[in-house]
């Protein structure tokens, strides 16, 4: 039996961007299909991360790849902007963000690399986009390493590890009761080990939105026991567990912009990867949406420098995409920003549901778009000219408004710039998109992350 590949999918269509714009998302966002929409209600779950604390069970929606062997660090350094070879001989564990560019410097994926030992790393991230690119190089290149896909949200096997995140003003008080010993003294993105009820766990300092936080992970067999201990300790501190609806809104205030489309579909140096990658993978079944339309698939790619990863690039080592990124590191065409939507214009969208007149695209709160696409691109305009795209939008009760992350031409990236965001997807062939008329929404440019006190990675 011949298995279809991503390359077969690309060859089978004359216009890949159009094909992805016509693709429906089945069962909503698969990452969160294992979670209830709400454990209590999404408004109080949102409030908790700024007023008390939250528990996020990350055991099921992230792809986790173990890479073991003498070249475990080498292959990641060859493909990522960080020189992971520098970790050799250093203490473990450590964690580093791991933005991975294509040969032109556009984002393939942005997982996190956990350094557990000189020949052992775990790469964890969204949909496995960067991890599959790494796996391809390990399997086809001259690397003394082995990749094990220990868990995929698209597979049938249960995870081998649990992963919990506790965030918010009361997170330290909760976790002080959960850890067997003293509260780990680690800052943002530092790691250590600890025990919980006698079980060994890894601990990552992962405060977000100006509040303290911890990420703990270990063998999945202890999932239920440790989760119960966190809930027990959190009861008197206002802890709430996040359901899928509130969870999907967490990236916006903290400034993490997921890939709207992995940059893997066009470059000739990635043809071998496209032939290797199965057509069952999400890359071959992507869904694009929003008011921005282009027939050029590369117009949906996003530059690593525009996303703010430039400060992490180590140009002293060779890696895929190095030359392209070096050319624009000092003069990026676009920058990541937050767009603050005008309240009255948002109310007008809902008001169109009543009375006469055309309907506007219904924004199901709190995450506005993920019911009908995987990568969202709404036009950002000034005087009718497209100057950027809004890519990830939500309502956040902590700000009492709608805000979104996106990228905008550098000359318009200053805080306070007034822009027009075009909301909707007129004449969409998707079954999940109702007939509607696009709506112009006034918006204001703000920093990303919007909660500016967040510490650097």
Regions found by a protein language model. Give the residues of each.
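Conserved, structured C-terminal
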Residues: 1-33, 37, 115-120, 124-457
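Peripheral, non-cofactor segments flanking catalytic/redox cores
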Residues: 110-112
